[in-house]
Amino acid sequence: MKLTCVLVVLLLVLPFGDLITTSNTEDNKRGATPWQNSLKARGVCSTPEGSCVHNGCICQNAPCCHASGCNWANVCPGFLWDKN
């Protein structure tokens, strides 16, 4: 039972790990990883002014997309790979 609880918590937290552990400021940017670059290359994300076409996210600060959809609030706070 404890193992099941741990696995459930990990599955809930892991998709948002990047949002939790990284600061999303202009002077603290990370480069895009190959996986993130391939998202753009496949056309999953479309970045017109503040919107994501394929997943319907509403963006607050910058064009942003995520392959599996929006975050828990249906709002993307500006993912790091879209600011490069």
UniProtKB/Swiss-Prot annotation:
Residues spanning the signal sequence: 1-19
Swiss-Prot/TrEMBL keywords: Bromination, Disulfide bond, Hydroxylation, Ion channel impairing toxin, Neurotoxin, Secreted, Signal, Toxin
6'-bromotryptophan: residues bearing it: W72, W81
Modification after translation: Contains 4 disulfide bonds.
GO cellular component: extracellular region
Family, per entry: Belongs to the conotoxin O1 superfamily.
Protein name per its UniProtKB record: Mu-conotoxin-like Cal 12.2d
Chief place of localization: secreted
Localisation per UniProt entry: Secreted
A GO term for molecular function: toxin activity
